[in-house]
């Protein structure tokens, strides 16, 4: 972190007496720049191209040095469109990596990868900036305390609980509800949590970013009257941005979160939607830089790039960063190198299933595929652990019996198996839940269910006390009392129809 008394723009200190180079080659978002002998910039230095295009329009493009090619040439990746750039244009070496504004001034604002505000609310105080490239905290600084992070979402809290200060991944293919789940978590946690949040929109839809911004203003997470009272900073590098911006926007968001953790000593929530797009952008840049592709066409440096981002997302003795990351799974294949590399860094994985989404069970979290390092009796307690294991066993048995049911019908099952199937179907439906952020689509009000209520509900189903209730009574309700009330209403309705 550094204090800049004067800056001519976010992350670009006064540019007089800097190294000057000239553009030698432009290949899409990649520039080759020639510098005078002995004046070569360092890797990751920010370069700025200023000038006018053929029509006289002002050009201001920031690039990041990626390779030193020899013969006084460097190869840099542009952070914005390279339209209008020409060979021979002057390039200024800023002498430092990209730096972005950090601290209280960032709250309630939307930034791009360079730390420039894009919300038309005027300039941001850039006296305190921080470079986006830094090393991860040392071993000795890390905090190893274990505690649960309650989300109010039944399936998550019971079967794959989140760790406070941990890393959580939401895995799913296209259109199974990753963004809705991450927005619900922002709604539930950011409101109840009281600390600050940073949202990094990496290569996702601009419309979703806009929806999120509007929703945060409505819910008060962003305070329009007094912007400094806001609880969140947003950083967006969406699908339409060049690969350089999408590759670095995650680091910009992380740098803002690190400042709150290290300097303000706060507990921070970092939401990243979508970490796969970070890998995808790295793959595009890698190809543009001429590196030989690795497995499935990904960059050979996939593990290194992922590690350099993920290792900085951690809890120290000063404060914590709890990170929730959406991970797109290409073609629903969890063995694809991108999701497989991400798995290694996570404390909890919430896997979304297309099969459950097709049944209309939302959130479509797979109770058998989702995992958490926190689901241990010494951390969550015996009662929680036992209930979770019995729910998983019942669901697993139902999964095994599905082939028999499909071929022979449920009448061929033993009495015990029939009871297991009936309870598993109730459990499957009770794992669904109406979301606050989906109220506009579903028409039913959202529900926050505490952990104790969740455990009680599943214990009642497993004990057989609710065997007489119809399974549709458990669909899209909050706690178990709502399910019994819904069953009574269904009973009354069926009697009236008769």
Curated annotation (Swiss-Prot):
Disulfide bonds: none annotated. The keyword Membrane applies. It is a peripheral membrane protein. It catalyses: ATP + H2O + 4 H(+)(in) = ADP + phosphate + 5 H(+)(out). GO terms for molecular function: ATP binding; ATP hydrolysis activity; proton-transporting ATP synthase activity, rotational mechanism. InterPro entries: AAA+_ATPase, ATP-synt_VA_C, ATP_synth_F1_bsu, ATPase_a/bsu_AS, ATPase_alpha/beta_chains, ATPase_F1/V1/A1_a/bsu_N, ATPase_F1/V1/A1_a/bsu_N_sf, ATPase_F1/V1/A1_a/bsu_nucl-bd. Its EC number is 7.1.2.2. It is an enzyme of class 7 (translocase). It holds the Pfam family ATP-synt_ab_N. It is found in: Plastid, Chloroplast thylakoid membrane. Keywords: ATP synthesis, ATP-binding, CF(1), Chloroplast, Hydrogen ion transport, Ion transport, Membrane, Nucleotide-binding, Plastid, Thylakoid, Translocase, Transport. GO terms for biological process: proton motive force-driven mitochondrial ATP synthesis. Its main location: plastid. One of its GO terms (cellular component) is mitochondrion. ATP binds at residues 172-179. Produces ATP from ADP in the presence of a proton gradient across the membrane. The catalytic sites are hosted primarily by the beta subunits. Belongs to the ATPase alpha/beta chains family. F-type ATPases have 2 components, CF(1) - the catalytic core - and CF(0) - the membrane proton channel. CF(1) has five subunits: alpha(3), beta(3), gamma(1), delta(1), epsilon(1). CF(0) has four main subunits: a(1), b(1), b'(1) and c(9-12). This is ATP synthase subunit beta, chloroplastic. The gene is atpB.
């Amino acid at each position: 972190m550094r204090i800049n008394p004067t800056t001519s723009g976010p992350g670009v200190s006064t540019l007089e007496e800097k190294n000057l180079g000239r553009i030698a080659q432009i290949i899409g978002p990649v520039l080759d720049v020639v510098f005078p002998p002995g004046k070569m910039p360092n890797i990751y230095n920010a370069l700025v191209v200023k000038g006018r295009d053929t029509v006289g329009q002002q050009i201001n493009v920031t690039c990041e040095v990626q390779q030193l090619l020899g013969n006084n040439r460097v190869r840099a990746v542009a952070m914005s469109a390279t339209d209008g750039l020409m060979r021979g244009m002057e390039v200024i070496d800023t002498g430092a990596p990209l730096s972005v504004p950090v601290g209280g001034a960032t709250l309630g604002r939307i930034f791009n990868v360079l730390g420039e505000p894009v919300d038309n609310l005027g300039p941001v105080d850039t006296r305190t900036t921080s470079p986006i490239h830094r090393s991860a905290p040392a071993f000795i600084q890390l905090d190893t305390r274990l505690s649960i992070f309650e989300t109010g979402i039944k399936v998550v809290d019971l079967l794959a609980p989140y760790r406070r200060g941990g890393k959580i991944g939401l895995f799913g293919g296209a259109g199974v509800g990753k963004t809705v789940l991450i927005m619900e978590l922002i709604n539930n946690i950011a409101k109840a949590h009281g600390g600050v949040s940073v949202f990094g929109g990496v290569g996702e839809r601009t419309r979703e970013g806009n929806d999120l911004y509007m929703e945060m203003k409505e819910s008060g997470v962003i305070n329009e009257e007094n912007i400094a009272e806001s609880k969140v900073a947003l950083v967006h590098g969406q699908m339409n941005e060049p690969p350089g911006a999408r590759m670095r926007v995650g680091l910009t968001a992380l740098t803002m979160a690190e400042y709150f953790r290290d300097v303000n000593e706060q507990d921070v929530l970092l939401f990243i939607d979508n970490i796969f797009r970070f890998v995808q952008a790295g793959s595009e840049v890698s190809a543009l830089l001429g590196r030989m592709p690795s497995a499935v066409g990904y960059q050979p440096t996939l593990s290194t790039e992922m590690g350099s981002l993920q290792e900085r997302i951690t809890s120290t003795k000063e404060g914590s960063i709890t990170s929730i990351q959406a991970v797109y799974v290409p073609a629903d294949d969890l063995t694809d190198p991108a999701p497989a590399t991400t798995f290694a860094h996570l404390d909890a994985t919430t896997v979304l299933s297309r099969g459950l989404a097709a049944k209309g069970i939302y959130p479509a979290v797979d109770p058998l595929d989702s995992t958490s390092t926190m689901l241990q009796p010494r951390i969550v307690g015996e009662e929680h652990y036992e209930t979770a294991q019995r729910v998983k066993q019942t669901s697993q048995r139902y999964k095994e019996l599905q082939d028999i049911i499909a071929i022979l019908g449920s009448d061929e099952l033993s009495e015990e198996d029939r009871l297991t199937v009936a309870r598993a179907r109730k459990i499957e439906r009770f794992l669904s839940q109406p979301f606050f952020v989906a109220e506009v689509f579903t028409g039913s009000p959202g529900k926050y269910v505490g952990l104790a209520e969740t455990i009680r509900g599943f214990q009642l189903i497993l004990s057989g006390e609710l065997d007489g209730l119809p399974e549709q009574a458990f669909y899209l309700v909050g706690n178990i009392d709502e399910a019994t009330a819904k069953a009574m209403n269904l009973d009354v309705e069926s009697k009236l129809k008769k």
